Structure formats: C-alpha cells, structure tokens
Swiss-Prot record:
GO molecular function, one term: dGTPase activity
Residues in HD domain copies: 75-219
Keywords of this entry: Hydrolase
Family statement drawn from the similarity comment of this UniProt entry: Belongs to the dGTPase family. Type 2 subfamily.
Protein name per UniProt: Deoxyguanosinetriphosphate triphosphohydrolase-like protein
An example Gene Ontology biological process: dGTP catabolic process
UniProt entry tagged with the keyword Hydrolase: yes
Record flagged with keyword Acetylation: no
Source organism superkingdom: Bacteria
PANTHER family (UniProt xref): DEOXYGUANOSINETRIPHOSPHATE TRIPHOSPHOHYDROLASE-LIKE PROTEIN, DEOXYNUCLEOSIDE TRIPHOSPHATE TRIPHOSPHOHYDROLASE
Length: 405
C-alpha cells in the first residue's frame, strides 16, 4: 500500500468533515457551561490528567512485576506512549487530536495491580458477581469512583470520550443485541441506561486511533523491555520476518552499532512502519466509504483505522513471540503466581472483614451492603491499588508475602 502525503494533515488545513466536533458534542451526563479557553475535548483530557487514577498508573506494571530496574515500562509510561502515537495519527487525518489523546490517556485506568495477572485473578474472584473487566472498570472510575467535583461523582466527561473509552476496540453488541466478545460487562450496561453510548456501533476515528496506537506501543515496547531484561535476544527476533528485516536495515546502515542504540533503531523503525501501514489502510477505506460526518464512521460497518492483513499477521507473530519467550517464561510465571496470590488473599480478607480496608472507605462505601454489592466495592478498592501498595498491605495482614523479584 502507498500513502498519499498530500492528503495528510500534520496540523495544516481544515478539520476533516468526519472528525468529532468538540463544539457540537453530544454533551455530558450532567450539563455544564462551556469554557472560553478550551474545547470540550480539551477539558476532558485535562480532567483525566489531574485524576488520582492517572497518578496511580506510575506504580502499576504491565509485564515485569517488581523489576530490579527503573527503566521498565509502567502503565503510565505506556499510556504516554500510546497518547503520543494516537495524537500523531489524529493529526495526520485532521481529526480531533485532543479527543484521541484523551481516550488514549484514560484507556488503562481500570487495570488492576500486577497487570493482566491481577485482572485475571480479580475476574475469577468476582465471577459469581458479574466478573471483572478493566475496560468497564475504567468507565466506573470516570463516571463514579473519582470524586473531585462538588456537583457530581466521576469526571462528567463528554459522550464522545466515554464512547471512545468503551468502544475503542469495536462494537460491544451486534445487531441482534448479543455481545460481540461475550456478555457486555454490567457496569457498561448500567451506565448506558443513564446515557446511551450506542455500543452496537463502531467508535469515532479518534477512538480507533487510540486503539491501534495501543497495539503499536504495546508490542514495540514489550520487545524493548524483553531485550533489556534478557528474556529476548536479537536472534529470537529473527523468527519474525518483519523484525528480521528491520534488523537487517539497521545493520546495513550502522554495521558497528552498540546494543542499546541498535535496539532503539529497531524500535523506532517498527513504530514508523506500523504507523505508515495504518495510515495507508485508513486512506484507502476513507476513500471507499466517503464519510460525510463522524456518525458515518460509526455506521461504516468496519474499523477504518487498523492494520493491513499483512501487518495484522506480523502483529500476531510478534504476540506469539512475546507469549512464548516472555509472558510464559518460568520466571515470569512464578512472579505472576505470587501476584495472583496477593490479590486473592486481599480479596478474601476484605470480604471476611471489610474494616481491614481504610476506615473511611469502609464506612462510606461498604458498610451494610449485601454480598454482591460488597464484592463489587471490594473489587473497586483492590483494582485501585498500585503494585507497591498491594504488596505493602499484604505484608501487614499476612505472615508471608510472595517474593515478586
């Protein structure tokens, strides 16, 4: 595929006709007056950045739990990298950069301590009460659990930002009302009774940009961290033809490059090639669909900003490599088992005696609740923990805490 550079925005020219319009938003659940200095989507982004949930991302890990180095990525550094790629894509298509950035910044709010390990453990514990889904938890955080404003709980974000948060990976329901990826999580269906997020349609282009940016950042930077940790080697990367080609390109241009610089040159090329692939695909689909509004994107029946078939296959190959060499490595599996034990122990302890949680949280949120509601609030409390806080509290409550090093 080729890219029409003349059609790209890069901050120049008018907003695309299919961009989300910050001056004509579908509004907020609780009506507010506008700002003289910022658009609605700018205000959303700023509210997201100033939350407790955003600050906590600094101490939540993705893959390398309790690493010995300060250079491994956390949820916060990953989120910033996703936002940068999402904003670059939005600029290329002349769509709203602030909305794309806002969705990218908020997309990981609902993640538990200890990455997907913590989420899997918490989902199993909460399964009798509806389960746990980090995307739905993100919605709970920004619509209920963040308590900063005098007139409402949550952040009172615009419809477009909430839609992007919930649907950035695609529609949640099909035309028959069935979940596209299993049952729609309860927090999402409950919220949609107050403000319909149209979960059977696709999301805006801005949200789609955030979603593919997440994939690009996730794979690229897990390779980087894997090489730093020693779980990956350059020889292992040769198993993926796309990565092998990037390494040949770097070696041909810089024959004697030291390892750290060599790694960086591979990573920057990987991001560039993936972004270029996404842009080429989106240009072709936009030319075919000819959308005249943001709603035309939502009703297009397909994802517009996505990988080509070839790059999607590369994405699968990279994920397979990461799973076999990193995520399923015996050292990582041992640490994951310990992390899951910490989450399980804390959940059971709080369910047996909720007063073990912070007293103000217990009095305000959990006292007197029946078991299903109590379990949901215990889940909220646990999901909001950072890795370090969960380990510290476990040490206070139990005689033995798993070693996560």
């Amino acid at each position: 595929m080729t890219i029409d550079r003349n059609a790209l925005g890069f901050g120049v020219g008018e907003r695309a006709i299919f961009a989300a319009d910050p001056w004509n938003s579908r509004g907020r659940l609780y009506p507010e007056g506008g700002s003289l200095t910022r658009s609605d989507f700018q205000r959303d982004r700023d509210r997201i950045v100033h939350t407790t949930a955003f600050r906590r991302l600094k101490h939540k890990t993705q893959v390398f739990i309790g690493p010995d180095s300060d250079h491994y990525r956390t949820r916060l550094t990953h989120t910033i990298e996703v936002a940068q790629i999402a904003r670059a894509l939005a600029r290329a298509f002349r769509i709203d950069e602030d909305l794309a950035e806002g969705v990218a910044l908020v997309h990981d709010f609902g993640h538990t301590p200890f990455g997907h390990t913590g989420e899997d453990a918490l989902h199993e514990l909460l399964e009798p009460y509806g389960g746990f889904d980090h995307n739905a938890q993100s919605l709970r955080i920004v619509t209920k659990l963040e308590r900063r404003y005098a007139e409402f709980d949550g952040l009172n974000l615009t419809w477009e930002t909430l839609e992007g948060l919930v649907k950035h990976n695609g529609p949640l329901m099909n035309a028959d009302g069935e979940g596209t990826r299993g049952p729609v999580p309860l927090p999402i269906t409950e919220y949609c009774q107050m403000q319909d997020l149209d979960i059977a349609s696709h999301a805006s282009l801005e949200a789609q940009a955030a979603a593919v940016a997440d994939d690009i950042a996730y794979n690229t930077h897990d390779i980087d961290d894997g090489l730093r940790s020693g779980y990956l080697t350059f020889d292992m990367l040769e198993d993926v033809p796309f990565l092998a080609g990037l390494m040949r390109d770097v070696r041909d241009r810089y024959p004697n490059l030291e390892a750290d610089r060599f790694t960086h040159e591979i990573m920057r090329r990987q991001i560039t090639r993936m972004v270029e692939d996404v842009i080429a695909v989106a240009q072709e689909r936009l030319a075919r669909i000819r959308p005249m509004s943001a709603d035309d994107i939502r009703q297009a029946g397909e994802t517009v900003i996505t990988f080509s078939e070839g790059m999607a296959e590369t994405d699968r190959q990279i994920k397979k490599l990461l799973f076999s060499k990193i995520y399923r490595h015996p050292d990582i599996m041992r640490i994951r088992a310990g992390a899951a034990q910490i989450v399980t122990d804390l959940f059971k302890a709080y369910m047996a005696d909720p007063t073990l949680m912070r007293s103000d949280y217990w009095v305000e949120h959990t006292a007197g609740l029946e078991t299903p509601a109590k379990a949901r609030h215990v889940g909220d409390f646990l999901a909001g923990m950072t890795d370090t806080y969960a380990v510290r509290v476990h040490r206070q409550l139990f005689d033995h805490t798993p070693d996560l090093r």
